[in-house]
Amino acid sequence: QAILNIFKNAQQALTLTENPLITIKSRITYSQPINGVIHSTLCEVSIIDNGPGIPQDIQEQIFFPMVSSKESGSGLGLSISQDIIRIHGGAISFKSESNGTTFSILVPINIESLNEEAKSA
């Protein structure tokens, strides 16, 4: 749901972009702190668009409920996404410029449980 919310925001941001592009990347990364806790293995997902970027005046509040850069938006998508990601022990961040926005999600992976699932499959 979190990734879908961010993807929908990217899609809506591209309505006036001449050659719209959304890129989703994922990778495994190691030993990074999230909210002061160091996790040994994490999944990082990045959603990148080439839209106009998030207006500077709302960037600091972008994860607050009811904050939206769109007139038709509810302002709940990013707030809900952040809550979902935090429930799973993860973190979300973004970088936005006039030529696009990148949202990055980091979520810890429990390698032991993945290995157990693979063995029982």
Task: List each language-model region with its residue ranges.
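A short glycine-centered beta->alpha linker in the GHKL/HATPase_c
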Residues: 14, 52-55
